[in-house]
Amino acid sequence: MSNHTQPKIAIIGYGSQGRAHALNLRDSGFDVTVGLRPGGPTEAKAQADGFTVVAPSEAVKSADLVAILTPDMVQKKLYEEVIAPNMKQGACLLFAHGLNVHFDMITPRADLDVVLVAPKGPGALVRREYEIGRGVPCIYAVYQDTSGKAEQFALTYAGGLGGARANIIKTTFKEETETDLFGEQAVLCGGASSLVQAGFEVLVEAGYQPEIAYYEVLHELKLIVDLFYEGGITRMLEFVSETAQYGDYVSGPRVIDAGTKARMKDVLTDIQNGTFTKNWVAEYDAGLPNYNKFKQADLEHPIEEVGKKLRAKMVWLNGQQQAAAAPANQQAA
């Protein structure tokens, strides 16, 4: 590492997280260079934000710390072909998600420190909280500590993002990867979206208006999740009616029962033993045939057409939609 108090940082990728990391770190006093493909979709945006933008192979050469903030499925090739041959001896390699390292798709050079720093929020929130003097909690991990300073570099980076203003928790690459995948699949994305679709179908098939069903099972979910976010499940229960509370107590366990929990454990097992990652890599390498089929099925679900019409009348959503982060498939370097 250089003798400077602050490490020279190369941010590879400029999607939602990449942009937030780069801006926050620069505002925290770090020397930040952004590495992007020449002519790529985010090059002009990074330049407009005032960053020096060079090819990733150039960006990593003089960097003390290289943060890989590109989508999971492009990281292996990026590391092997661009980063590993050009990254200087003894530098620190940083990830925001441990999938590639934990499941041995990337084997970092032995001379490198390898760490993980993951803000627990989307990029737009990471930036917004920093700008108003607060921060988003971060988790961090050390995979390889060649210099003896890897943990300090992770903490310094997390602090530069604003994480020290909130909370910084130590984890491992294994724990971060497996819990993150499980949360996405069983609860946050897979579990929640399937629950909402099923609830909508039950009401519509029973003869209720699709518009009413949409409001009851999807639109109002935000109100509940906001209460979860602010104070946990018990806070939510404090703010709903006694009728809703009683329904929660007696009907929730009928929907999410021991069988559901057992299947959630199966999902976790597939994550832990690498089955999910193996299948995902094979799917990606095959050109995403099933992924695209599943995606199209979601787009064609009746709840989407109903929701589109109803949201068009919710004028307060327009500003929020414009400010939303880009979809994951638009966040490549």
Swiss-Prot record:
Residues in KARI N-terminal Rossmann domain copies: 1-171
Residues that coordinate or bind NADP(+): 14-17, 37, 42, 72-75, 123
Pathway(s) of this molecule: Amino-acid biosynthesis; L-isoleucine biosynthesis; L-isoleucine from 2-oxobutanoate: step 2/4; Amino-acid biosynthesis; L-valine biosynthesis; L-valine from pyruvate: step 2/4
Keyword Oxidoreductase carried by entry: yes
Reaction catalysed by this enzyme: (2R)-2,3-dihydroxy-3-methylbutanoate + NADP(+) = (2S)-2-acetolactate + NADPH + H(+); (2R,3R)-2,3-dihydroxy-3-methylpentanoate + NADP(+) = (S)-2-ethyl-2-hydroxy-3-oxobutanoate + NADPH + H(+)
Cofactor (UniProt): Mg(2+)
Binding locations of substrate: 241
Highest rank taxon of the organism: Bacteria
PROSITE patterns: KARI_C, KARI_N
EC number: 1.1.1.86
Single Gene Ontology MF annotation: ketol-acid reductoisomerase activity
GO annotation (BP), single: isoleucine biosynthetic process
Binding site residues for Mg(2+) 2: 180, 216, 220
Record note on cofactor: Binds 2 magnesium ions per subunit.
Residues the record lists as binding Mg(2+) 1: 180, 184
UniProt keyword annotation of Amino-acid biosynthesis present: yes
Domain KARI C-terminal knotted span(s) in chain numbering: 172-317
Active-site residue list: 97
GO CC terms of this entry: cytosol
HAMAP family per UniProt: IlvC
PANTHER family: KETOL-ACID REDUCTOISOMERASE, MITOCHONDRIAL
Similarity field: Belongs to the ketol-acid reductoisomerase family.
Function: Involved in the biosynthesis of branched-chain amino acids (BCAA). Catalyzes an alkyl-migration followed by a ketol-acid reduction of (S)-2-acetolactate (S2AL) to yield (R)-2,3-dihydroxy-isovalerate. In the isomerase reaction, S2AL is rearranged via a Mg-dependent methyl migration to produce 3-hydroxy-3-methyl-2-ketobutyrate (HMKB). In the reductase reaction, this 2-ketoacid undergoes a metal-dependent reduction by NADPH to yield (R)-2,3-dihydroxy-isovalerate.
Name of the featured protein: Ketol-acid reductoisomerase (NADP(+))
